[in-house]
A protein has these predicted regions:
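Conserved N-terminal subdomain of the carbohydrate kinase-like
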Residues: 2-3, 12-20, 35-114, 118, ...
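Short beta-strand/turn micro-motifs composed of small residues
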Residues: 8, 44-46, 139, 199
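Active-site metal-binding loops of divalent metal-dependent hydrolases
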Residues: 8-10, 230
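Conserved alpha-helical elements of sugar-nucleotide-dependent glycosyltransferases
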Residues: 24-25
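Alpha-helix C-terminal capping segments
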Residues: 30-39, 238-241
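Short beta-strand scaffold segments in enzyme catalytic cores
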Residues: 31, 76-79, 203-207
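Conserved beta-alpha-beta core of the PfkB/ribokinase-like small-molecule kinase fold
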Residues: 109-185, 203
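Conserved phosphate-binding/catalytic region of the ribokinase-like
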Residues: 152-156, 183-264
């Protein structure tokens, strides 16, 4: 089985006023991949000055890691009220170039953990998608503008980005931002073969093969930071093993519930 990969910027996250801690899609996705035992590779980027703080917690998860040095480290502050989140972008992370993708040649499925629109330009995604590689993009890479300050989503993304995407994962507010609704026609208009909309404790919606299917979830206690990243990683593990999209979402829902409840 060819390995799955997660690529993206690591971040420093401050949750509810606490001390900064490692974050970013690669870190949260790696937690799910470790639990599921799927051969995988993690490629990350951040400033070298933060390497000692960010890299060891990721390496301890047991997956091979490719480090790419950047000019900055993405830094965020979060606060939560149930499923509602307020977020402050303190510093943007670096952009990924085609050269940063070296070492991913054998990968079949790639989770692109964009934290902002500037992380993965269309040219970089086009390179990732070569050779029938399947690219799964986090909707943060469409809706989060490349500016610091309180996070305000918008739909000013480059449509060329979606030409290279096989799976698009959107949070509910991201879907509403870019297409206005979360219904079948709205998600179809994106032109992506598979679209998964996560609804927090209410589960998810899966659009695939022209049909929209709801996937329920049971509310789970725990810090939800990174739950979407873990969900997408678990979803891709099942898809790469031959499971259908809806079945993959159900399995991913169970994995996230286990991680939030610290049962896995």
């Amino acid at each position: 089985m060819r390995p799955l990969a997660v690529v993206g910027n690591l971040s420093l996250d401050r949750v509810d006023g606490g001390e900064p801690r490692p974050g970013g899609a690669p870190f949260h996705a790696a937690r799910a991949l470790r639990v599921l035992g799927r051969p995988a590779l993690v490629a990350v980027k951040a400033a070298d000055v933060d390497r000692r703080r960010l890299l060891p917690p990721l390496v301890r998860l047991g997956l091979p890691v490719l480090w790419r040095a950047g000019a900055s480290t993405a830094t965020f502050a979060f606060s939560y009220d149930g499923d509602r989140r307020a977020m402050l972008v303190e510093e943007l992370g670096p952009s990924w170039t085609v050269d940063d993708l070296r070492g991913l040649e054998r990968v079949e499925w790639v989770q692109v953990g964009a934290l902002a629109r500037s992380d993965f330009p269309a040219t970089t995604l086009a390179s990732l998608a070569r050779g029938r590689r399947k690219v799964a993009l986090d909707g943060q890479g469409l809706t989060r503008p490349e500016r610091p300050g309180p996070l305000v989503l918008d739909a000013d993304y480059d449509p060329e980005v979606l030409r290279h995407v096989s799976v698009l994962k959107l949070a509910e507010e991201e879907a509403v931002t870019i297409v206005g609704e979360t219904d079948e026609d709205a998600l179809r208009s994106l032109g992506v073969p598979e679209v998964v909309v996560t609804l927090g404790s209410r589960g998810s919606l899966v659009f695939a093969e022209g049909t929209l299917v709801p996937v329920p979830a049971r509310p789970a206690d725990g810090d939800p930071t990174g739950a979407g990243d873990s969900f997408l990683a678990a979803y891709l593990v099942s898809r790469s093993a031959g499971y259908a999209p809806v079945a993959s979402a159900r399995r991913a829902t169970a994995v996230v519930a286990g991680l939030l409840g610290q049962r896995l």
